[in-house]
Amino acid sequence: MANLHWEKLMSDIIEVKDLVEVYSDGTKAVDNISFNVKEGEFFGFLGPNGAGKSTTIKILTTLLRKTSGQVTVAGHDTDTDASDIRKIIGVQSQETTVDGDLTGRENLTLQGHFQQMETSKIKKRVNELLKLVELQSAADKRARNYSGGMKKRLDLATALIHEPRLLFLDEPTTGLDPQSRTAIWTYLQKLNKEEGTTIFLTTQYLEEADKLCQRLSIIDFGKIVASGSPAELKRQVGADSIQVALENCEKDKPQAKALLKSMTEVTEVIETSEECLTVYAKNGGVLIADIVRALDSSDIRLKSVTFSSPSLDDVFMRHTGRRIRTEELVKAPSRMFGSGRR
């Protein structure tokens, strides 16, 4: 049994090679990407809105034909073996698909019939899922009366009704409050660890990818810019980051950059569109006072200085020159120094 389990973890359930997707207007939504997902893995696809995440997941779930490249799911080609793939996958899209006129139990039962499950098995599975997503008390209430978080949980349950080998989640927690988001995380971790379900998650939330995913790929403008475990990717950054915002960024940036690069503790200085400059340094926390004094002595007006330990946002910026910024972005709090606002 142990050997079989190991073989399962070592085998690829998703294989993508040189995938390209070009829309009819000429837009290249996915630009020659390659990656693999192992069976039993919790894999993340991290990137800002418009990066190509949803397009990729549509191809993987057979909803969109690729322009070129090779894509297989459980050994089946996404273009020629769509029906075989759909039997073994579950999909939760960004928008909830529950029927508000039906109760939670009725929504799940209907989905079971769509999957051509036996009636006796449907009843048992519905009860299991209602317990999993903690909707037993609301099971016989119409879904239109559910909160946003409850609808998301019901939507997740419908994707699991037929016990799929592989679950695709396209930004499943977008728009949820922190409590509901944390609850979804708990269910997903349980599915992956206790039931061995392979999970492919697209997300724009840094904390979500960091907490849940064993491995991930970061995508931007249709290209994969980095891949690895969250810990590996953060180790590649290797240093603390200090975001330096100047009152007059365009005027003072060249002088400030040269000044900061001359400091012996600094390993790298990158120009960014948000904070003006990002400084990488070992033990960056103790360097902040020196940065403030150095800029002040050169009559460079400082707006703010923000310090943080290596994060996935730093990984993204290292590869793209900017940060992942969206209204819904969730990041660990960082410490702010200075009187200015970000």
Predicted features along the sequence, with ranges:
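Residues at or immediately flanking beta-strands
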Residues: 70, 142, 241-243, 301-306
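ABC transporter nucleotide-binding domain
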Residues: 186-282
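C-terminal coupling/interaction segments
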Residues: 2-7, 283-342
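ABC transporter nucleotide-binding domains
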Residues: 11-14, 21-226
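A generic structural signal for secondary-structure junctions
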Residues: 90, 116, 155, 238, ...
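Hydrophobic/anchoring residues in structured secondary elements
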Residues: 21, 268-271, 305-307
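A short, local hydrophobic-aromatic micro-motif
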Residues: 14-17, 31, 67, 267, ...
